[in-house]
From Swiss-Prot:
InterPro entries, alphabetized: Ribosomal_bS21, Ribosomal_bS21_sf
GO MF: structural constituent of ribosome
Lineage of producing organism: Bacteria, Pseudomonadati, Pseudomonadota, Gammaproteobacteria, Cardiobacteriales
GO CC entries: ribonucleoprotein complex; ribosome
Protein's UniProt name: Small ribosomal subunit protein bS21
C-alpha cells in the first residue's frame, strides 16, 4: 500500500495528488478492478493470450512501417 508523508507547509491538495500518483504507479486501482469479480483460469489465460497477440501485432506493424520508410 503506497504511503505519503505530508511535508511541512505542504497543502493537502499537493499531498493528495502525490498519493494518487503513487497509487497509480503501484497499480492499486487496476488490481481492485481485476479482483472485483472472479475470473476463471481459462478466461484469464484467454485474456492474456489475446493481449499478447495484440501487442505482438502492434510491434510487427511498427517494424514493417519502419522498414517501408527506409527506401
Amino acid at each position: 500500500m503506497p504511503s505519503v508523508k505530508v511535508r511541512d507547509n505542504e497543502p493537502f491538495d499537493v499531498a493528495m495528488r502525490r498519493f494518487k500518483r503513487s497509487c497509480e504507479k503501484a497499480g492499486v486501482l487496476a488490481e481492485v478492478r481485476s479482483r472485483e469479480f472472479y475470473e476463471k483460469p481459462t478466461q484469464e489465460r484467454k485474456r492474456k493470450l489475446a493481449a499478447a497477440v495484440k501487442r505482438n501485432s502492434r510491434r510487427l506493424k511498427k517494424e514493417r512501417s519502419r522498414f517501408e520508410r527506409l527506401y
